[in-house]
Design a protein with these regions (language model features):
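Well-ordered mid-protein domain cores that form the structural environment of catalytic cofactors
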Residues: 1-40
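Extended C-terminal regions of large enzymes
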Residues: 34-583
């Protein structure tokens, strides 16, 4: 059992024995390593789930930042408990004055809240528009109720003041409801990010369940844990506080064990298997009898404790739930009923769920969700969709970006595919590839729109290139960055072709579960009230997208010509050697 130490100040790398850490959770592991090194050390560690090679496991750093998709099991298979990194030098900046100017410009004119929502969720004196679904939730009368020194009001936060940007997003209340307000200490987030999207709560009662009273997370990890209760979580003192308390218990356990939820699919799979009688069918009678299903029905948080322990330590047949959706479908013979069940939200028969798919700009989100090998983790399009601006403005922006207002459909009022939607899909995918490459957050970027009426709510899509030049000193345009992103995305596609050993991406990879087409049977496709898709239209959509990318229009795999255009001649040669290039 080893720890990898990297001390960047001396560019020193060493492997150290970690026997004394094996069996510990991610939190205790991090604390021990920081005692041995420095409080400034950043530790990425696995918990018991990774040690036990649980497929749905991850590595955790900074308490709750998860690298999922089985990375924990990979580290565990190598007996690698943690990677510890310490650095003392600053980041080299070619033009600090320009960097500061761009930062001020972004902070005062462009940036919104989480997901770059640019209007508040409630009507406010400074705002022309509001949208109750916006994550710009700051308002008068909404407080960080458990803040040190007393409650702090979020208040009205008009754009322009950099020091108040961090108040705009209030994820604990957004994710968990009003009952979370009195337990919220503050919002936090990734290092140096002005958008504070991470909940930080303090709930003394949580200690009764053997976990720290403090903690937090964001998005699905914030609220998913109590969704397994068929009758909802049991309240303690106040209405809906069971959801808040139960989820803090759940996320503290989940992150400490180093489990990964597959964007909530683990919990949906549990609900499916419980409600459909699968567990009763596949679990040995003795195991089924010892599980406290009465606690589940009662919404008792103790059930979560037992459930997560079983998953992380691979106890019994139930623990195979954490093998992933594809594996349990095979192991437990779940069949088409499972894959076609709309509430289960499985996008692909490979076992990953929707992530802003058909419900997010129709064919655009659908294409995006077909392109990766797990939930797609692409927010370029959903940030634009959820900005909070009125439909008329969004369609105007879409015309400027993609050539036609028809690129942008009203949610659940879709139209057939067109060329502008294909450009929208390509833009969404290339931007996420770019952001991943230059380490920008695709949960905020790109700056497509702005909160300022004086800018007519237009953002600045060249900002990535401007920052790139200021930081590196290298001449850069957005067109060059887009080309680099296209190279990255095409390389990813080529690698998928190689790993799957097939050119036929359309029929072997870009697959969609049946419920996406069969839901809402009483509502015709392309009429108001449904976000279902049409099979023929999606076939045409993929063909058009393949052509736009320079891939084979029938197979959906990169051509030699496109690989050469992108400077990937070696990749073309490798694919050709394996008979994986189209004729």
């Amino acid at each position: 059992m080893m720890i990898s130490y990297q001390e960047l100040v001396r560019t020193f790398l060493s492997l150290e024995k970690a026997d004394f850490l094996w069996g510990k959770g991610t939190r205790a592991t991090t604390e021990e390593i920081c005692r041995l090194t420095s409080p400034e050390t950043c530790v990425a560690a696995i918990g018991q789930a990774g040690e036990n090679l649980v497929p749905l496991s991850g590595m955790l750093n900074s308490r709750n930042h998860s690298g999922g998709a089985g990375t924990g099991a990979i580290m565990g298979s190598k007996n690698l408990k943690a990677i510890a990194v310490e650095g003392t030098k600053g980041v080299n900046i070619a033009d600090r004055q320009e960097m500061k100017r761009l930062n001020d410009y972004m902070m005062t004119e462009l940036i919104g809240a989480n997901n770059n929502h640019v209007v508040p969720s409630t009507p406010q004196s400074w705002a022309e528009y509001s949208d109750p679904k916006s994550r710009w939730t700051a308002r008068k009368g909404l407080f960080w109720g458990a803040a040190e020194g007393g409650p702090i009001e979020t208040g009205e936060i008009p754009p322009g003041n950099q020091n108040t940007v961090g108040f705009r997003t209030y994820k604990s209340v957004f994710d968990l409801g009003p009952a979370a307000e009195k337990y919220t200490v503050k919002m936090s987030g990734c290092h140096s990010c002005p958008i504070r999207c991470m909940t930080q709560m303090n709930i003394p009662r949580v200690k009764e369940f053997g976990v720290p009273s403090t903690g937090g997370n964001t998005c699905v990890a914030n609220f998913v844990h109590t969704t397994i209760f068929p009758n909802g979580p049991k309240d303690f003192e106040d209405k809906d506080d069971g959801r808040v308390i139960g989820n803090l218990v759940g996320l503290n356990l989940f992150d400490d064990y180093g489990l990964w939820c597959n964007y909530g699919q683990l919990h949906r799979d549990f609900t499916y298997c419980y409600s459909k009688g699968v567990f009763k069918r596949v679990l040995p009678a003795e195991e089924y009898a010892e599980i406290r299903w009465d606690q589940l029905e009662a919404g008792d948080v103790n059930f979560i404790k037992d459930f997560y322990y079983r998953l992380a330590h691979r106890v019994g047949e139930l623990s195979h739930l954490a093998d992933g959706s594809y594996a349990i479908a095979e192991r437990w013979n779940l069949g088409e009923e499972y894959w076609g069940y709309a509430k289960n939200k499985l996008w692909s028969p490979f076992g990953y769920p929707v992530h802003h798919a058909n419900e997010a700009s129709a064919q655009v989100g659908s294409i995006v969700n077909c392109m990766f090998n797990r939930d797609c983790m692409t927010h370029t399009h959903i940030n634009f969709i959820g900005s909070g601006l009125p439909l008329k403005l969004q369609r105007e922006v879409a015309k400027e970006l993609f050539g036609s207002e028809d690129a942008y459909d009203e949610t659940k009022n879709y139209t057939p595919i067109n060329d502008a939607k294909i450009k929208y899909a390509k833009w969404s995918l290339l931007r996420v590839c770019l952001h991943n490459a230059v380490t920008l957050c695709n949960w905020v970027w790109p700056m497509t729109v702005s909160p300022l009426k004086s800018r007519n709510y237009r953002g600045d899509l060249a900002l990535e290139a401007k920052f790139f030049k200021a930081i590196t000193g290298e001449e850069m345009t957005q067109e060059k960055l887009d080309l680099a992103a296209e190279r990255i995305f095409t390389l990813h596609r080529a690698y998928t072709v190689k790993l799957m050993q097939t050119k036929d991406m359309r029929n072997e990879h870009d697959l969609i579960c049946s419920w996406v087409f069969d839901k809402d049977p009483q509502i015709p496709v392309f009429t108001e009230g449904t976000d279902k898709m049409d099979r023929d239209d999606m076939h045409a959509s993929l063909t058009m997208f393949y052509k736009e990318m320079g891939w084979d229009p029938q197979l959906g795999c990169p051509t030699r010509e496109t690989l050469q255009r992108l400077g990937l001649e070696d990749i073309a040669a490798d694919l050709a050697a394996h008979n994986l290039l189209p004729a």
